[in-house]
Design a protein with these regions (language model features):
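C-terminal accessory regions of radical SAM enzymes
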Residues: 3-7, 14-33, 166-169, 382-523
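Conserved beta-strand elements of the Class I
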Residues: 21-23, 215, 228, 546-550, ...
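Glycine- and acidic-residue-enriched helix-capping/strand-helix junction motifs
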Residues: 31-43
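Generic structural signal for well-ordered alpha-helices
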Residues: 43-47, 73, 98-101, 150, ...
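Glycine-rich beta-alpha loop elements in corrinoid/cobalamin-binding modules
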Residues: 49-185, 405-407, 411, 628-631
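Conserved C-terminal portion of the radical SAM core fold
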Residues: 52, 84-86, 112-113, 247-250, ...
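Radical SAM [4Fe-4S] cluster-binding motif and immediate context
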Residues: 192-367, 499-514
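Hydrophobic, well-ordered beta-alpha structural blocks that scaffold small-molecule cofactor pockets
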Residues: 482-503, 513-648
Length: 648
């Protein structure tokens, strides 16, 4: 709908009902965590602001709902008589927003839709074209904008007067309102609507005394640094909440929900001050904010994790103070082990500084995680080798390392470079195709594709095997009634035994908990044990040649590394990714989905995280001959007879 139609419909509905009702939706994230998750909280902030503004607000957390997104949304619209539906989405889950809005328009033609979140903030033009069912785009922070939008709609005003919106003109053009100023007084915002989005309605984790109840805690917004790969969806102006405001919320979380772990969900928790005279970073302000937080959080006896920047200001004294106050893990932005690449990324750090900070963090008894990304314009075969060697040298210092190609997120400097150089010719199709990996390096296309398809996945598997050997999970147990996996584990540091509940998604190197005795991180690499449990059933399904493995990404690669079946049986593998179709995966052909009809396929095993629901919907709509669909993550529960024991 265009802005004129929206105004007419909203005015009529407001006269009829007195107030408009809005439904806010939080996407499915399929978190990889074992006993806690940190879902996106942007919609929860907007919901809290609207409720404080006395609006009629309903909420859906798709992560907590069973069934298709279309059915969930349509049922909610009918039950609650919804007038407006809002969705907060990142680029990676825009298809969920599309599905929700399409279902909404089918259910109620006059419903008003708006899209917010990082996807709209970074790519408003593209998202409005990509999802024609979106009536209103909301750019930037949504708390004030959403309230003004609702007021304007209920009062019959002109939406063009609401800062921070993108609207459709009657002729189809887009109208960009004035930008919304950033919210500098973060203390003025209400706390997120935890209850509305069922944040703490976690699945039962058994009678374990170590069960974690984790809450995300936003203490600041914005990041002033200029890393070339970052989309800057939160802006470059850094503004912080006061400690009084922060700990009023901590009090509420602990007393009301029994929180025993906090994840500080800031781009940068505190900033070092650049000392122009000394030519180096000074830690005075940075240290004082961290010190104050440590002093205040210690009496709560909760665990906490955060993102920080490496540097000399991370002193041994500060790290010890963090450890003593309950900090269990620090996530550092590593990115590369090569100084040339780090400089090209505008990181402002060196490999030597990274190594020094990581080693001192580990020595302080804190968990240390880092991500290595590949494909910067300065990347060469030599820099790749140096980064791999760097990660190997520090392998025993990290509790978690991940390896991934650089993704060109809209809004980032690298994305803009790719557009200017003609590497991205259609920005809408680029998003629709899932932000395909794009070669900005001086490497040949063949060398780059080999890095993406073979070398980075091999480094991931190498890390997995290293962790599996060092941590040694002893038992993978299955509860068929609850569809739950449990691991019994002996800590390699202190020798104590613990059990932990796992989501069925927890088959990658992103799964961990803390040893209840020594509080050190324990990584679970369960794919090897899981593969042993499901191999027999997979073999039965593949035997007649009528089963396809759908999805050639991470979960497939990890299963391929540990499966005793895939290496001895012919099987069909499909994926919509054009690059995978062209080059295959680990020597195996990837068939386009539209070629399946001629293959006589009648069943599919879905091997995907984020795209599971869209794949299933696609199969139901376009491949009726595929009558049986299995979720690989839950395949073990179909295999009760093959796994006649509860554990290995």
């Amino acid at each position: 709908m265009n802005c004129f139609e929206i105004g007419c419909i909203a005015k009529a509905r407001a006269i009829e009902k007195g107030k408009l009702s809005i439904l806010l939706i939080s996407p499915r994230t399929h978190n990889f965590y074992s006993d806690w998750s940190v879902p996106p909280i942007g919609p929860a902030y907007v919901s809290a602001a609207l409720k404080r503004h006395k609006k009629t607000v309903f909420t859906l957390n798709l992560e907590k709902e069973e069934g298709s997104i279309a059915d969930i949304v349509q049922n909610a619209i009918k039950e609650w008589d919804i007038d407006i539906i809002g969705f907060g989405a990142l680029i990676v889950n825009w298809r969920q927003a599309e599905e929700a809005f399409q279902a909404a328009k089918e259910c109620k033609e006059t419903i008003i839709t708006y899209l917010g979140g990082g996807s709209m903030t970074c790519s408003p033009t593209e998202m409005m074209e990509l999802i024609p069912e979106v009536d209103i785009g909301m750019i930037g922070e949504g708390e004030i904008t959403a309230c003004e939008m609702m007021d304007t709609l209920e009062q019959g005003g002109d939406l063009k007067n609401v800062d921070g919106l993108v609207l459709r003109e009657p002729n189809g053009d887009l109208h960009y309102n004035a930008p919304r100023e950033i919210i500098r007084e973060l203390d003025s915002l209400p706390w997120p609507d935890w209850d509305g989005f069922k944040f703490f309605d976690q699945e039962p984790a058994g009678d374990f005394p170590n069960r974690l109840v984790c809450a995300p805690l936003v203490t600041s917004r914005g990041c002033p640094f200029h890393c070339t790969f970052c989309s800057k969806s939160t802006g470059t102006a850094h503004h912080q909440r006061s400690m009084d405001s922060i700990f009023a919320e901590v009090d509420h979380l602990v007393q009301t929900y029994g929180i025993n772990r906090l994840f500080i969900d800031d781009d940068v928790f505190a900033l070092p001050i650049w000392n122009q005279d000394a030519g180096q970073e000074s830690g005075r302000k940075y240290k004082s904010r961290l010190e104050e937080f440590c002093d205040k959080i210690k009496p709560y006896s909760v665990e906490w994790l955060l993102y920080l920047r490496v540097g000399e200001y991370m002193t041994d004294e500060l790290l010890s103070l963090m450890k003593a106050s309950g900090c269990v893990e620090v996530f550092y932005g590593i990115e590369s082990g090569d100084d040339t690449v780090l400089h090209s990324m505008h990181k402002g750090i060196t490999a030597a500084v990274i190594e020094d900070t990581v080693r001192r963090t580990h020595a302080a008894g804190l968990g240390c995680s880092g991500t290595f990304i590949f494909g910067d314009p300065a990347e060469t075969l030599d820099t790749v080798e140096r980064t791999f060697a760097f990660s190997d040298r520090l392998s025993d210092q990290f509790t978690n390392m991940s390896f991934t190609p650089i993704i060109l997120f809209p809004g980032s400097s690298l994305y803009k470079k790719a557009v200017m150089e003609g590497k991205i010719t259609d920005r809408v199709e680029f998003i629709r195709n899932g932000l395909p990996f794009t070669n900005l390096t001086s490497m040949s296309e063949e060398e780059y594709r080999e890095l993406i398809r073979e070398r980075i996945p091999a480094q991931r598997v190498k890390r997995m095997i290293c962790e599996e050997t060092s941590h040694r999970p002893q038992k993978l147990m299955i509860d068929y009634n609850k569809k739950a996996l449990y691991i019994n584990h002996v800590c390699r540091r202190c020798g104590s035994s613990s059990e932990i509940y796992l989501r069925p998604e927890s088959l990658t190197d992103h799964t961990y908990h803390l040893c209840p005795k020594c509080k050190q991180r324990v990584d679970y690499i369960v794919m090897k044990l899981y593969a042993q449990l499901v191999d027999q059933y997979v073999e039965e399904l593949l035997q007649d040649g009528q089963t396809v493995l759908w999805g050639a990404g991470t979960i497939y690669r990890y299963y391929q590394a540990f499966s005793g079946v895939l290496g001895k049986l012919p099987y069909l593998l499909t994926d919509s990714n054009l690059d995978l179709q062209e080059h295959g995966v680990a020597g195996h052909e990837v068939v386009p989905p539209d070629k399946l009809r001629e293959k006589g396929i009648c069943r599919a095993i879905i091997m995907a995280w984020y795209n599971y629901s869209p794949i299933v919907d696609d199969i139901h709509k376009n491949y009726p001959e595929i009558e049986e669909v299995y979720d690989f993550r839950e395949l073990v529960f179909h295999n009760k007879q093959s796994a006649d024991k509860r554990h290995l």
